[in-house]
Amino acid sequence: VRVVPGETPGDQSDRGVRQAIDRMGLPAIIKASAGGGGKGMRLVLDVGAIDESIQAARREAVAAFGDGTLYVERLVAHPRHVEVQIVADNHGHVMHLFERDCSTQRRHQKVIEESPSPAVTPALRARMTKAAVAVARAANYRNAGTVEFLVEMDAGSDEGPFYFLEMNTRLQ
């Protein structure tokens, strides 16, 4: 299962983070490595905004999490946040409970969850639920859980690639 291309630069100086962005290309997102919930995130669309974005992301990361380590990630165009709930038992059985769309957000926090996702076609649903089951199997997971994906919805295509975000060890 793919993840969004990104890295935690070994050189965490402003220059080192800038070089990571240069390698990845724009548009990009700078994120607080210790963070979540949208804190310490900065969208970088043009070269002129890189330095200011690095400094702002680092300040917010330190203030919110006490850690200024930054992560750089490629921006996924037109994203949808789609989650698949799974259940796995002690006998190796893993099943999915289909998907829900959590794309309606405010400040990177979910506001509305919709199931089934209006953006997911039957073919994409089959690929995503198969991937969610594969994630649980690869981790030898036993319990109920939620596998989160970011789906890239390109203009003119509803079969865009999707990327693994995280797995929560509970139903959400």
Regions found by a protein language model. Give the residues of each.
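N-terminal beta-alpha lobe that positions the nucleotide/phosphoryl donor
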Residues: 1-147, 151-172
